[in-house]
Amino acid sequence: MQRWSGVLLISLCCLLRGALAYTEPIYEIVEEDIPAEDIEVTRTNEKQDGRVFSKRDFDGAMPGVLRFGKRGGVWEKRESSVQKKEMPGVLRFGKRAYFDEKKSVPGVLRFGKRSYFDEKKSVPGVLRFGKRDVPMDKREIPGVLRFGKRDYMADSFDKRSEVPGVLRFGKRDVPGVLRFGKRSDLEEHYAGVLLKKSVPGVLRFGRK
């Protein structure tokens, strides 16, 4: 008898626990007066499908912007002269500076074609993470991850352009280079260092 009473007690506890688990929560709705300014901002940022997006900075360079499509033109003088023209398909995360410097803060992820300078063109499919230096120097800090073709350093330091498919982390002359592709066909000495050849498909990490 005591055995069955224990079973019934356990069953009742389980039933009560299940009933409490399915209890609907009660929410308190607080009605507040919304200022007219907030209503206007919400209307301006509301899309046709009802989605509301946060307002961007005045200069259009708010960090953390994920954008797909075409921005305003630099030479068209739409709203301001600091807007940069880019082809559709640009995916960028990060804040850029003004168009005369063409700088990007670390954390820029971009896919698309850059064509604001003829000597700095990149083929479509460029994936780059890192900060670029002054555009006339064409240098990049360590931490650049890029997939695409480089063709603007063909005349400097006896370096030829690289074939598409180059994956590189770090600067060219610092230890820790991870690269897939063809380096150079030259066997000449530069600054006392022998330029080594690499066949396409070489994955290397370490010193040159």
From Swiss-Prot:
GO terms for cellular component: extracellular region; extracellular space. Expressed in head neurons and weakly in ventral nerve cord. Expressed in the interneurons AVA, AIY and RIG, the motor neuron RIM and the pharyngeal neurons M2 and M3. EMPGVLRF-amide: Expressed in cholinergic pharyngeal motoneurons M2 and M3. Coiled coil: none annotated. InterPro entries: FMRFamide-related_np (IPR051041). May be processed by convertase egl-3. The keyword Repeat applies. GO terms for biological process: neuropeptide signaling pathway; regulation of muscle contraction; sleep. It is found in: Secreted. Residues 1-21 form the signal peptide. One of its GO terms (molecular function) is neuropeptide Y receptor binding. Belongs to the FARP (FMRFamide related peptide) family. FMRFamide-like neuropeptides. Ligand to G-protein coupled receptor npr-1. Involved in modulating locomotion quiescence during the sleep-like state called lethargus which occurs during molting between larval and adult stages, acting via npr-1. Together with flp-1, plays a homeostatic role by acting on the GABAergic neural transmission at neuromuscular junctions to prevent overexcitation of the locomotor circuit. Plays a role in the navigational capacity of sperm and the targeting of sperm derived from males to the fertilization site in the uterus of hermaphrodites. This is FMRFamide-like neuropeptide 18. It comes from Caenorhabditis elegans.
